[in-house]
Amino acid sequence: MASLLHLLLLSLSLLVLASASPSPPADEGSYIGVNIGTDLSDMPHPTQVVALLKAQEIRHIRLYNADPGLLIALANTGIKVIISIPNDQLLGIGQSNSTAANWVKRNVIAHYPATMITAVSVGSEVLTSLSNAAPVLVSAIKNVHAALLSANLDKLIKVSTPLSTSLILDPFPPSQAFFNRSLNAVIVPLLSFLQSTNSYLMVNVYPYIDYMQSNGVIPLDYALFKPIPPNKEAVDANTLVRYSNAFDAMVDATYFAMAFLNFTNIPVLVTESGWPSKGETNEPDATLDNANTYNSNLIRHVLNKTGTPKRPGIAVSTYIYELYNEDTKAGLSEKNWGLFNANGEPVYVLRLTNSGSVLANDTTNQTYCTAREGADTKMLQAALDWACGPGKIDCSPIKQGETCYEPDNVVAHANYAFDTYYHQTGNNPDACNFNGVASITTTDPSHGTCVFAGSRGNGRNGTSVNITAPSANSTTSSGIRSDLYYSRGIWSILTVMILNVANIL
């Protein structure tokens, strides 16, 4: 009897320990993510950003900061997030453990695991854009990692920093590539840290920039992933490996540059890659068609899991630069790297036949009716009252305790009421006016479990999305929900064990 009780107590201890600690994320192979910049004159609300991500089935994003509003909106969505420490904060974090710990507490611990933060990007292209911060870069990375370690999150959240491929000298043939030796005092300890923590090297890969700077040496088709005949492929004379596109050659140059410093097992994560859809007069190849061609082919190439010629079959996950056109940036091409405009309309519709579902939805045919930005709240309330009264729509989902009650404000409730009325009239544009306080948008206003009429996410008016426990071999995650189901499973097992022991006794 004593041995049975001892066994039960031991099992209880092990199971409680297991349920208390999240497990490291499983390797999901190569994936496509998207960068989200905020240099827009009319930045969409975080709930609109998340609605667009959901509509396009984007499951991985990278932020250039740790915007709390967006991190809150991303909670319980299952979208995996890389957050960033801006370059102008590096000095403080690199010089002070406590500053790094406070940053992690405020921007990671406050949101995780509801928001699935997978990595912290410490600065961006620091060695080429902020040379005075180079001496503290590795210290900043280590201080952030130490703060994650103290919170038992170091196995769950990676720490790295994006490098520009301009640091790689003699990039072709790739087998001869090496990092700028003048920066080895920073790069060697950086790579040593990445290797010791099982992290990845973040690299920004832009065939467009290399193509522009090559003065015609790099063919356009080679930069765009377009098919080229075998006799036009680039051949590495040292390895006899053939390259059919610039992207693979640049990634392999990164692998070889690391190997030159005796680091051969650090994976590469491409944190930025893309092509502008407009440019200045000296950028004739910054066109809609070329941007569409490059990004469509990039997505197809990454998701085919072919890897690179040096490392075939090894995942090279990539984040497209970028989700929105950033109209406040200087220079025409800098304003036009986005896949979408601020209102959610696609700049172009990607050609992604047989390439999975990510970014494959044409949002141009999806329209919604929402409150016009800056509309008078009294007029909004009057229009809301009309829609729920004489307008004869079902407003029960925005009552207290129901699926669309939160956020509890007139704009959110008006959005639901206006859109429901609009869809009940068959998407009649005249129905989306409400005395001038409403307007039509292509951005899905659904949020959390509140799914609007016509949403690709569900298509039901204000009803909650079904949430079921993931299967034992599920490769997806849903933040707190998955932890909840896991905990329920643990306690179910404990209950069975206790009952069995009781029967034996």
Curated annotation (Swiss-Prot):
Disulphide-bonded residues: C369-C432
Superkingdom of the source species: Eukaryota
Lipid-substituted positions (GPI-anchor amidated serine): S477
Presence of keyword Cell membrane: yes
Membrane topology qualifier: Lipid-anchor; GPI-anchor
Propeptide stretch(es), residue numbers: 478-505
Family: Belongs to the glycosyl hydrolase 17 family.
UniProt name for this protein: Glucan endo-1,3-beta-glucosidase 2
Organism: Arabidopsis thaliana (Mouse-ear cress)
